[in-house]
From Swiss-Prot:
The lineage of its organism: Bacteria, Bacillati, Chloroflexota, Chloroflexia, Herpetosiphonales. GO terms for molecular function: rRNA binding; structural constituent of ribosome. One of its GO terms (cellular component) is ribosome. Keywords: Ribonucleoprotein, Ribosomal protein, RNA-binding, rRNA-binding. This is Large ribosomal subunit protein bL20. The gene is rplT. Belongs to the bacterial ribosomal protein bL20 family. Binds directly to 23S ribosomal RNA and is necessary for the in vitro assembly process of the 50S ribosomal subunit. It is not involved in the protein synthesizing functions of that subunit.
Length: 118
């Protein structure tokens, strides 16, 4: 039986990983072992932060809605309660976008929410 030498496959695997580590500083982009650790850590951070991004944006939208609602004399929780009672179905992303880009439309929505609360 012929002896199997895996030098070519190892070189390919190492090269692939070092390409993933492009842009990393120092030996983290040149040395296979440290590059491997850096890439694995980067992938773990990326996985974690893809989930955190959803939370972060929701928090940002809520902060923006709350700020705009308070300018119209209503707190965030009262606004959401009023929207539910008025039967207005609009997600926080769209509501925050309205608050930033179209203050008149946001004020009209807040007025309907206030009416439903009264």
């Amino acid at each position: 039986m012929a002896r199997i030498k895996r030098g070519i496959m190892t070189h390919k695997r190492h090269k692939k990983l070092l390409n993933q580590a492009k842009g990393f500083r120092g030996s983290r982009s040149h040395n296979y072992k440290t590059a491997h650790e850096a890439v694995m850590k980067a992938l773990a951070y990326a996985y974690r932060d893809r989930r955190n991004r959803k939370r972060d944006f929701r928090r940002l939208w809520i902060v923006r809605i709350n700020a705009a609602a308070r300018l119209n004399g209503l707190s965030y929780s009262n606004l959401i309660n009023g929207l539910n009672k008025a039967g207005i179905v609009i997600d926080r992303r769209q509501l925050a976008d309205l608050a930033v880009r179209d203050a008149a439309a946001f004020t009209a929505i807040v007025a309907q929410a206030k009416q439903a609360l009264a």
